[in-house]
Amino acid sequence: LVAALAGMVYSLLLAFASINLKADQTIGGTALNLLATAIAVVIAKYFSESGSAKLNYANRPFLFSIGGLELSIFVPLGIILLIISYVVLYKTRFGLRLRACGEHPQAADSVGINVYKMRYAGVVISGALGAIGGMAYIVPPVQTWNFEVGVAGAGFLAMAVMIFGQWKPFNIFGAAMFFAVFKSLANIADSTFLAQLHWSSNIYNMMPFVASMIILAFTSKNSMAPKAEGIPYDKGSR
């Protein structure tokens, strides 16, 4: 909950820059991404007894067992959020209005939809979900996390997953599972037949990013992105 709230508050900076100031979303997002790492390091050092950017977890939180199989609570949570996202986007008035503001904002405005409010809502919700995803990435696998290391480009990989999934919830889920297979190879390489290859774990860590570049090179031309994606809305333009 705290992570989601923090993500919502931080996403307001991007919303203000891109919606009110009409700044380039890519530049603004990259700047905030770099700033977030620095803020995380400062906060971690403030709360750390050793003064380092590492935080230790006494227990491995957010884990539960089913028949001896240890799972993260974020697994069922992710499935629930996937279903909720689909229902909200395609079966509710709010979702239809939100999609309209991404496809044809001028047309949405002409029927009385406040495009600015809807885009703010979209950014804030995305900030909350992104923060939950970041927490899922750093908490369950380890007992110590170094904030100076960061998440090794996982956020940019998530953007590739979104593009590969054509901005549709269930397609994105399938794309995420595809890239997760490559991501998991680095974790199991030493304990499976892959160990006989004697490859560095860095090679397996590279695979999701290499795969994303190859796939996007062939699929980006058929992208079904919202028509107004990345375009600042000007109420005076028609």
Predicted regions and their residues:
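Transmembrane alpha-helical segments in multi-pass inner-membrane proteins
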Residues: 3, 140, 145-209
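Transmembrane helix-bundle core of multi-pass membrane transporters
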Residues: 36-91, 195-203, 230-238
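Cytosolic-side transmembrane-helix boundaries in multi-pass membrane proteins
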Residues: 85, 103-117, 190-238
